[in-house]
Amino acid sequence: MRTTHIEDRDNNSLENKHTDHIEGVENGKGTQEPPSPSGFGGHLIDENLVHVEGEDKVTWYLCFLISASAIAGFLFGYDTGVVGVALPLVGTDLGGNELNSSQQEIITAGTTIGAIFGSAILGGWGDHLGRKMAILISDVFFTVGAVIIASSYSVPQIIVGRIVLGVGVGGAAVIAPLFITETAPTAVRGRCIGVNAFFIPFGQLVADSIGAGVQNMHGGWRLLFALGAVPSLIQLLLFHYLPESPRILIVKGDIDRARNVFQRIYPTATHEMVDYKLRVAQEYVAATTALQSGTTFWERVKKVWKTGSYRRSIIAVSVLQAAGQLCGFNTLLYYAGTLFGLLGLSNPALGGLIPAGTNAVFVLIGMSTVDKIGRRGLLLVGVPVLLLGLVWNIIGFYYMCKPTGGFLDTSYSYDTTNVGIVIGGIVFYVAGFGLTYSHLVWYQAEYLALEVRSMGSGVATTVCWIANLVVSVSYLSELETMTPSGTYGFYLGLSVIAFVFVVFCFPETKQLSIDETSLLFENDWGVKRSVQMRKERHETRKRFKDVELAEAATAHFEARQQKSASVSPAELSKFMAGLKGGKRKPQVLV
C-alpha cells in the first residue's frame, strides 16, 4: 500500500534541521540557548501539519481523562451554587438566631476569599507541583471544607469551612482547564475544555435540584454541604489512574512517559507519527521555558511583567475573567433563594433552577459550536445578548418595583405579570452568559505561553475571584441602596466596557495549536495576527492537500498504465473530483 502524506514529507525535511536540539531535550538537559519561536524560518514545526490518524476523534481514553478532570468543574459549580439554596434553610442552627444579610454575605464570600488564595498559590506553583498533584491537593481541601461546613454549629465555624473549601475551588478553577488544554488534541480541544466548563453550571444545577428536594427536611442544609465531599473523593480515586500533562513531563525530562501519554491519547496513530507529535511539543517546550531557567519566582514575575507578549496575554485573559464576574451573573447563584423569594415564588430553591438550568443549556450550545464559530466569534455574538438581557432586567425591575418606591419589599405581593417579565429578562440574560463567559473564560490557558501558563492562569483566576468577592459582598447592599434597576444598570456599564475590550483586544484561537496561540501577543493584542495566522494555515493545508491529491491521482493512473489500461481526460477529471469531494481516499493499492 502506498499512502501519500504531505505532513510526513514536510516533517522529514525538518527532522535533520532540529536533530541536535531535539536530542538535547530528550536527554532531559535542554539547551543553553533555546531557539525563539521565530528561529525556524519564522515558525516552529506546525502541529496542524503533523496529522495523526484519529486525531479529530474523541477516544474512550480521552473521554475518561476529560471526564475525570472535569469533576473539578462540577465541584466548582456545586460548591459555589449550593450556598444560594442552603443558607435560607439554616434557620437558627448557627447560634440560635436567624442569619442577617451581613452574615449571609460573609459566609458566601468565605469561599471566594479561599479561592483567591487557592488560585494564586496552586496556580503559581502548578509547574513545580505538576498539574496532577495540584488537582489532588485541591480535592483534599474540597473534602475537608465540606466536612467542616456540614458539622458547623456557629457562624465562625462555617466561615472557616467555606474558606478551606474555597482554596480547593480556586486551585481546581486554575489547574483543571489547564490540564485539559495541555492534553487534548487541537481538533477537539475546544469541546474538551467545554466539558469542564459545562460541569460548572451542571454542578450548580445539581445543587439547586437537591436543594429544592430538601426544603422541608430538618438539617437539610447540612446534607447539601456534606454531599460536596463525594465528587472530590471520586476524583481522588480516579486521578490515581491518570497521567501527568505530557508537556510537564517534557519539562521535567521524562520523555518516555510523555511519549506513552501521547500514544494513549492517539491510540490509532503509528509510533512514527506519535514521535512527530512529541517532537513538536519538545520544540515549543524548549523554546518557551527559558524564562524558568536559573531565576527565582520573583525574578520571573518581574520578567513576565516587563515582557510585552506575556503581559498582554495575561491582561487579556484577566479582563475576560473579570468581565464574567462583573456582569453580575453569580449574584443569581449566591442569592437565588433570596431573590426569587422576594419575587414571590413559593419555593425559592426551585426558582434557583431557572438560571442554573438556562446556563447549563446554553453552555452546551456554546461548547458544541466553539470549535466552528470560535472563542472570539461566540463573544461577539453572545455578549450583545447578555447586554440586551441586562437592559431587559433594568426595565423589568423598574416597572415591577414602582409600587414599592423602586426597591424590593418582602412584604409586598408584586403583580405576577411583572414578575414574569423580570424572570424572562433573567433567562435572556443568562442565555447570553451561558453562550460566552460561563465557559469561554476557562479557555484562558490557550492564550498563555507554557512558561507563564500556570502563573498566568493563577493571576487571571485570582482576578476572577477578587471580582467575584466584590460583587458577592455588595449585591444585597446594592439592592437596598441602588435599587434593583440601578444595580443591574451598574453591571450593564461594566459589561459594555468589557465588550469594547473584547472587540479590539481579544484574538481568536480557533484552528491554532496550543503552542501557536502564545505567539499571538508578540507585537500587539493579536486580533489581526490571529486572522492572518489562520488564513495562512488554511492556505498552507489547502496547498498541501492539492499536492497530496495530485500525487494520489498520478500513482493511480501509473498503476493503470502498468496494466496497459488507457486513461481518458474525462476519467482523470472524474477521479480528481472524487478525491476532492471526499468520495475517494488519497491512497492507492499498487
UniProtKB/Swiss-Prot annotation:
Residues 1-57, 127-132, 179-192, 244-325, 371-376, 442-455, 507-590 are cytoplasmic. GO terms for molecular function: transmembrane transporter activity. Pfam families: Sugar_tr. Residues 1-26 have a biased composition (Basic and acidic residues). The chain crosses the membrane at residues 58-78, 106-126, 133-153, 158-178, 193-213, 223-243, 326-346, 350-370, 377-397, 421-441, 456-476, 486-506. One of its GO terms (cellular component) is plasma membrane. It catalyses: myo-inositol(out) + H(+)(out) = myo-inositol(in) + H(+)(in). Residues 1-40 are annotated as: Disordered. It is a multi-pass membrane protein. Residues 79-105, 154-157, 214-222, 347-349, 398-420, 477-485 are extracellular. Induction: Induced during sexual reproduction. Expressed during infection. The keyword Transport applies. The keyword Chloroplast does not apply. GO terms for biological process: myo-inositol transport; polyol transmembrane transport. Glycans are attached at residue 100. Keywords: Cell membrane, Glycoprotein, Membrane, Transmembrane, Transmembrane helix, Transport. It comes from the Eukaryota. It is found in: Cell membrane. Transporter for myo-inositol. Belongs to the major facilitator superfamily. Sugar transporter (TC 2.A.1.1) family. This is Myo-inositol transporter 3.
